[in-house]
């Protein structure tokens, strides 16, 4: 006579219920994936890449600083004062040490002459507290290029060399390093962005023409690519940058340096685009578009390029760090942006003197955002590349 184990039916029902829920959940997930667009699938894969998400947040924060550089800078980056040269960085003290109340301030500075070098040096005077104001008034600027403003994130009222705030210290000419770093971030990151945009256009157009038409067009484009890639990049950039006249304006030099950096960057993307076009031009939808009377430009840019647009985005994101490094290197060597222009490379020019760096190590601080941005873009590019890979 068969015995019934108490609770066995309930356990079986519960197990069946759990399996059913798992099966339903699996079916729903599969159905969701089957109806998702390419961009949705990319986003789902991308957000699983934690380092890429961190890199994306860092990049967004830096470009927010690019847009609001004037607001974040509390001092005019061009105003110099020999009386406050090479002041060490100051830290904001958030609470009053005497009362314990919230009172953001920086300790005052006392200037005196060094009896050995006869240079003016500054010492901290804890008895003097310089209040730090948020949304303080300062030098005038134009937000977004057309809105006149004079408000800044932080600042102090008036003040002289002994009563001012210098978050990252000052350079040898007494210019505030924090404010100059904000403006340098704007120049360096926009040069990289514009250079990548130019490389993107050249790479897609020339690579697309090479792969779609083939024949002598493909031969000419590929030979040009091989010639450009056979020339050492740094000497080529240095030679072209050295040919820029010294009397050109900052805007003229900006666009010339952008073009010089873009000169080599488009070749790798052009080869990738050419390879994809060689495989796509034999597809049925291309033949259908040709038979329906579509012109060749429409076939290339409307029908073929969108099929691997995600790969192009990933490739351009990975190319951005190289562009930024190129501009910084050229400017550091004195062949890129030149004073009065402000870029990361221009700021690092003062760090070429070992003796100056030994006395004022904060002059090396502009190298920190360079490292952070390069790492962030590399993580972001890796995440986009993996997300754009349908076999990943």
Where would I find each of the regions flagged by the language model?
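Gly/Trp-centered helix-boundary motif
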Residues: 1-200, 204, 340-341, 351-380, ...
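Alpha-helical transmembrane segments of integral membrane proteins
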Residues: 170-392
């Amino acid at each position: 006579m068969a015995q019934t184990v108490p609770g066995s039916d309930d356990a079986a029902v519960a197990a069946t219920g759990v399996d059913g829920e798992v099966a339903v959940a699996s079916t729903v997930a599969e159905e969701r994936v089957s109806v998702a667009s390419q961009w949705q699938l990319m986003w789902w894969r991308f957000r699983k890449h934690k380092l890429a998400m961190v890199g994306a947040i860092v990049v967004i924060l830096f470009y927010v600083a690019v847009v609001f550089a004037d607001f974040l800078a509390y001092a005019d980056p061009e105003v110099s004062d020999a009386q406050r040269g090479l002041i060490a960085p100051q830290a904001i003290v958030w609470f009053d040490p005497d009362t314990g109340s919230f009172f953001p301030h920086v300790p005052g500075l006392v200037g005196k002459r060094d009896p050995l070098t006869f240079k003016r040096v500054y010492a901290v005077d804890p008895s003097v507290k310089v209040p730090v104001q948020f949304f303080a008034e300062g030098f005038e600027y134009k937000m977004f290029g057309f809105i006149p403003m004079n408000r800044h994130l932080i600042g102090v009222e008036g003040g002289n060399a002994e009563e001012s705030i210098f978050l990252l210290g000052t350079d040898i000419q007494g210019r505030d390093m924090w404010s100059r770093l904000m403006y340098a971030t704007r120049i360096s990151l926009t040069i990289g962005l514009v250079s990548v945009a130019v490389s993107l256009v050249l790479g897609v157009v020339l690579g697309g023409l090479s792969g779609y038409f083939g024949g002598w067009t493909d031969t000419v484009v590929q030979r040009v690519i091989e010639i450009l890639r056979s020339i050492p990049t740094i000497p080529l950039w240095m030679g072209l940058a050295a040919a820029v006249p010294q009397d050109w304006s900052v805007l003229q030099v900006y666009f010339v340096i952008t073009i010089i950096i873009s000169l080599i960057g488009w070749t790798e993307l052009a080869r990738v685009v050419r390879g994809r076009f060689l495989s796509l031009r034999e597809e049925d939808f291309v033949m259908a578009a040709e038979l329906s009377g579509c012109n060749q430009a429409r076939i290339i840019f409307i029908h073929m390029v969108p099929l691997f647009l995600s790969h192009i985005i990933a490739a351009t994101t990975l190319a951005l760090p190289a562009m930024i490094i190129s501009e910084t290197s050229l400017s550091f060597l004195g062949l890129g942006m030149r004073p009065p222009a402000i870029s990361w490379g221009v700021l690092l020019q003062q760090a070429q003197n070992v003796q100056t760096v030994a006395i004022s190590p904060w002059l090396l601080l502009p190298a920190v955002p360079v490292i952070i941005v390069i790492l962030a873009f590399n993580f972001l590019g890796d995440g986009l590349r993996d997300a754009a890979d349908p076999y990943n």
